[in-house]
Amino acid sequence: MLSTPVTSQLRLKEFQDVYEPAEDTFALLDALEKDAKKLRQMAEMKNLLTAEIGCGSGCASSFLKSGILKNKPIVHFMSDISNSACRASKITALNNRELYKDDNGLFITVQTSFLDGIRLGNGVDILIFNPPYVPTEFEEIPSEAATIASAWAGGTDGMDVTSTLLNQLKDILSQDGVFYMVAVARNKLHSICEILQKDGFIVNETLKRKAGRETLSILRIYRIGNTIWDE
């Protein structure tokens, strides 16, 4: 079992608006570790381009890049609308490269919405996303990037932010790529499946876990015909 990345810098006041690793984060880490063998198999086949959207603390990014895919020649992008989150993620990446003894590959942090402005085309091989999934009134979705609410307020059915990415996924993920996303039961998982199936994707619920009043699901999503992930 891999160690959880260290994110001790989040105790500093300058990072008070950065979402700290919580049950949803740990569920995502467990899902990634569950698939570690296949993820490493992907890295043996080619130099991967990987990314996390809404990187927050950078915990999941460091776990994937420096933990599971340690010493692989990977370029990993971390994006967030929050400047504080981008800075926190960069520190997490640097600190945990030493922890995991990861001496290869590259972390790139970009302050942006989704992957806007980063010309990756259909080039992302592994994509991870722990979206703001809590159902809220639309007015509760913050317009300011530096608010902690931007990490959890998901609007109607908790799907406002997620739906935007799902509609872009076919233009982001590589042919043999895989996408891991956190969701909760209130997000209407059947609707997520319907949206993605129309675009030629297969959706697997790879992990399910209770967290307080929520039921967390980690979805593994890939294109039809992806021979690595077809089960």
Curated annotation (Swiss-Prot):
The protein's superkingdom reads Eukaryota
Give the protein family: Belongs to the eukaryotic/archaeal PrmC-related family.
**Keyword Signal set for record:** no
What is the enzyme's class at the highest EC level?
transferase
Stated EC number for the protein is 2.1.1.297
The molecular function terms of the Gene Ontology recorded here are:
nucleic acid binding; protein methyltransferase activity; protein-(glutamine-N5) methyltransferase activity; protein-glutamine N-methyltransferase activity; S-adenosylmethionine-dependent methyltransferase activity
Catalytic reaction(s) noted: L-glutaminyl-[peptide chain release factor] + S-adenosyl-L-methionine = N(5)-methyl-L-glutaminyl-[peptide chain release factor] + S-adenosyl-L-homocysteine + H(+)
GO BP term, pick one:
methylation
Binding sites annotated in the UniProt record for substrate = 130-133
> Keyword annotations for this protein?
Cytoplasm, Methyltransferase, Nucleus, S-adenosyl-L-methionine, Transferase
What does the UniProt record say this protein does?
Methylates eRF1 on 'Gln-182' using S-adenosyl L-methionine as methyl donor. eRF1 needs to be complexed to eRF3 in its GTP-bound form to be efficiently methylated.
Subcellular localization is given as:
Cytoplasm; Nucleus
Q: How does it assemble?
A: Heterodimer of mtq2-trm112. mtq2 is the catalytic subunit carrying the catalytic and the S-adenosyl L-methionine binding sites.
* Gene Ontology terms: cellular component: cytosol; eRF1 methyltransferase complex; nucleus
Please name the InterPro entries in this protein's record.
DNA_methylase_N6_adenine_CS (IPR002052), Euk-Arch_PrmC-MTase (IPR052190), SAM-dependent_MTases_sf (IPR029063)
Residues engaged in binding S-adenosyl-L-methionine:
54-58, 80, 130
Name of this protein: eRF1 methyltransferase catalytic subunit mtq2
